[in-house]
A protein has these predicted regions:
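Walker A (P-loop) phosphate-binding loop of ABC-type ATPase nucleotide-binding domains
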Residues: 2-7
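Helix-to-loop junction immediately C-terminal to a conserved catalytic motif
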Residues: 16
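ABC ATPase NBD Q-loop/coupling interface
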Residues: 27-43, 107
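Q-loop/switch helix immediately C-terminal to the Walker
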Residues: 50, 54, 60-75, 87
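ABC ATPase C-loop
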Residues: 123-124
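Walker B catalytic motif
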Residues: 132-136, 143
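Helical segment within the ABC ATPase nucleotide-binding domain
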Residues: 145-158
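Conserved beta-strand-loop-alpha-helix hinge in the C-terminal portion
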Residues: 174, 179, 183, 187-209
């Protein structure tokens, strides 16, 4: 969490290797492997996933074809149609997503909530080691937020990690975070649990700045 301009989205971009961001110092390690020099696609194959704030629309490409192609690209393994289709339907039902969405063109005509649910479906299919959700709750009403983040909670396991970037405390109604980090001026200034979120909701980020002399 952090105020506008704190560097939250920049952190996400650095982790996935977005070309508009440059890492000037330090190391990025994934399972003890330094990945500083890896390109975006190479990091994706290593297991890093980024959910976009504003997912792209691609006419002519169905959700199912997109996901099957992405799975093949990430794993390097052929995904046979019927087996993949059956697995996809099972995942969609688990996430309370209408299986008919699989035949729709990617994000075309989707509501904001449907686009975000589709991002979570991508997570379920690709099974990343590190999933970064950059303000996935942005623009969602409470009902859509509930559906999306209950889906996120279902995908959390002991074998993966999730970095959830948000401005708002409402997502924590549906998630149980291991840690809450506060980012200000490009660095983590405070770490704790849900009590930090409650303090921010009550007093704002100014209280943290004051307490830490920032």
């Amino acid at each position: 969490m952090g105020p506008n301009g704190a560097g939250k989205s920049t952190l996400a971009g650095i982790l996935v290797g977005h070309p508009k961001h440059e890492l000037t110092s330090g190391e990025i390690r994934l399972e003890d492997e330094v990945i500083n020099d890896l390109a975006v696609d190479e990091r994706a194959k290593k297991g890093i996933f980024l959910s976009f704030q504003y997912p792209e629309e691609i006419a002519g490409l169905t959700v199912e074809d997109f996901l099957r192609t992405a799975k093949e690209a990430i794993t390097g393994e052929k995904q046979y149609f019927m087996q993949f289709h059956n697995d996809l339907v099972e995942k969609m039902e688990k996430l309370h997503i209408n299986p008919e969405y699989a035949d729709r063109h990617l994000n075309v005509g989707f509501s904001g909530g449907e686009k975000k649910k589709n991002e979570i479906l991508q997570m379920a299919v690709l099974e990343p080691k590190l999933a970064i959700l950059d303000e996935t709750d942005s623009g969602l009403d409470r009902d859509a937020t509930k559906v999306v983040f209950e889906g996120v909670q279902k995908l959390k396991t002991k074998d993966n990690a999730m970095l959830i970037i948000t401005h708002y405390d409402k997502v924590l109604d549906y998630l149980e975070p291991d840690f809450v980090h506060v980012l200000m001026d490009g660095r983590i200034v405070k770490t704790g649990g849900k009590e930090i979120v409650e303090m921010i909701e009550k007093f704002g980020y100014g209280k943290i700045r004051q307490d830490l002399g920032l």
